[in-house]
From Swiss-Prot:
Name of the featured protein: tRNA modification GTPase MnmE
Record text on cofactor binding: Binds 1 potassium ion per subunit.
Disulfide bonds: none
Gene3D superfamilies in the cross-refs: P-loop containing nucleotide triphosphate hydrolases (3.40.50.300), Probable tRNA modification gtpase trme, domain 1 (3.30.1360.120), tRNA modification GTPase MnmE domain 2 (1.20.120.430)
Family matches, as PROSITE patterns: G_TRME
Keyword tRNA processing appears in the UniProt entry: yes
Encoding gene (name): mnmE
NCBIfam families tied to this protein: mnmE_trmE_thdF (TIGR00450), PRK05291.1-3 (NF003661), small_GTP (TIGR00231)
Length: 452
């Protein structure tokens, strides 16, 4: 883990020409460096304009400086932010001057890591910073903001408090080995642990929603050749992304694009049509299509209404899960006769549209949004969306709570019961980072960008 006694500096904005560039410095020498740059004692949390001079006295730029004294800064340390004009050459000259004044280059995520180590953020809030940076939809943004403001930490702390209350009573009996926990006490403690267990299960149930909003809803477009899959992709994306031809088998490989549908991010995947007797190259495309289908969150199964008997290929239909399949009846403008399908009731929903002229797209967007909305679970007033790390820790806590409940009900020794409760607390503590695990922390913050 990087030493906290160093003063670090980095560019906090992306490299490249822009209106502004922002540099950060944080650590014990920050106040001294700020005084040298400003030529006076820095005013806390006030924007101060100054000609930035390097150590040789050369003016590099007219900049704006803001000094945040500890502990009320992002990192919990003295922190300086410098805004320069967005010329990469100027930003690099200022950064090199900060290094010459005693700063060292910050590692990836080191500013946020210091915020965590100095108690400004818990680990789940630090992860929310990364979620906020990468959010690609309103739902992802909302969930990240809730987590950044401590929503997940509060709910986990509520579970921890319940377990601690039970553990305190159990350990009181360990000090008096001649006495057993009375059955009435065991019932009360079991009820408390059942509540803790229920709350942990509620949080775990939000992981599916968390995956969807963080990664985007992988929506795979499937169907027979020439039913309009690529035309639909192009229409949804708003440009000619996929090649469209009257010749079957034009799409040989899958194509992926991201679009916003309401408050959701959708990862659209166009696939090769499922042909009965494909050519060798086309067969390879079909194999890739089936791989994408197996990994889909949502499937848009396309049927062609210009066909007198519109239907899905049997080989495709048997692979579809009705709960995540939306039937899309395309080419409504060319409907040849039968415009109601016998199998419509078995799917999540059905939409009529024309990819060619753009009819029915609002209905399609609405259906996709409704499918995604069903996964959102609010816990109290909070939007919670746990990630895989949180879910794993909660699962370990559940396992320990179940073991504790079994021992509590069977009248096992208080020492054994206390051991399970401590295991549950250890797992729950991992979520907020209250358990010291240096390797885990280093790996997590290494995924952040430099300057954050």
């Amino acid at each position: 883990m990087p030493p906290l006694e160093d003063t670090i500096a980095a560019l906090a904005t992306p490299a490249g020409i822009s209106a502004l560039a922002i540099l950060r410095a944080s650590g014990p020498d920050t106040r001294r460096i700020a005084e040298a740059i400003l030529g006076r004692t820095p005013l806390p949390r006030r924007i101060q304009r100054v000609d930035y001079r390097d150590r040789a006295g050369h003016i590099l730029d007219e900049v704006l400086c803001v000094f945040f004294p500890q502990p009320r800064s992002y990192t919990g340390e003295d922190l300086l932010e410098i805004s320069t004009h967005g010329n990469p050459f100027i930003a690099q000259r200022v950064l090199q001057d900060l290094f010459a004044r005693g700063c060292r280059p910050a590692g990836p995520g080191e500013f946020t890591q210091r915020a965590f180590l100095n108690g400004r953020l818990d680990l789940s809030q630090a992860e929310a910073v990364m979620d906020l940076i990468h959010a690609q939809s309103d739902r992802a943004l909302a969930a990240a903001n809730h987590q950044l403001r401590g929503s997940l930490g509060r709910h986990v702390q509520r579970i921890i408090d319940r377990v601690v209350r039970v553990l305190a009573q159990v350990e009181a009996y360990i000090d008096f080995p001649d006495e057993d926990l009375p059955s009435s006490n065991r019932d009360t403690l079991a009820a408390e642990l059942e509540m803790a267990r229920h709350e942990a299960e509620q949080l775990i149930a939000t992981q599916r929603y968390g995956n969807l909003i963080r990664d985007g809803i992988k929506t795979v477009i499937v169907g027979a050749p020439n039913v309009g899959k690529s035309s639909l992709l192009n229409r949804l994306v708003g440009r000619e992304r996929a090649l469209v031809s009257a010749e079957p088998g034009t799409t040989r490989d899958f194509i992926e694009e991201r679009i916003a549908v309401g408050e959701h991010c959708i990862r659209l995947v166009d696939t090769a049509g499922l042909n009965v007797s494909p050519a060798p190259l086309e067969a390879l495309g079909i194999h890739k299509s089936l791989e994408q289908l197996a990994d889909a969150d949502l499937v848009l199964a396309i049927v062609d209404l210009s066909d007198p008997e519109p239907s899905l290929p049997p080989e495709l239909a048997k692979r579809l899960d009705p709960k995540n399949t939306l039937l899309v009846a395309n080419k409504i403008d060319l409907c040849a006769g039968k415009c109601v399908l016998d199998t419509v009731d078995q799917w999540f929903g059905m939409v009529f549209c024309s990819a060619k002229i753009g009819v029915g797209l609002d209905d399609l967007f609405g259906a996709i949004g409704r499918w995604a909305d069903q996964w959102q679970i609010t816990v109290g007033q909070d939007v919670i969306a746990v990630n895989a790390r949180h879910s794993h820790a909660l699962a370990l806590a559940l396992e320990a709570l179940d073991a504790a409940l079994d021992k509590l009900r069977s009248g096992d020794a208080a020492e054994l019961l206390a051991s399970d409760l401590r295991s549950a607390l250890l797992a729950l503590g991992d979520i907020a980072g209250r358990v010291d695990n240096e390797r885990v922390l280093d790996e997590l913050f290494a995924t952040f960008c430099i300057g954050k």
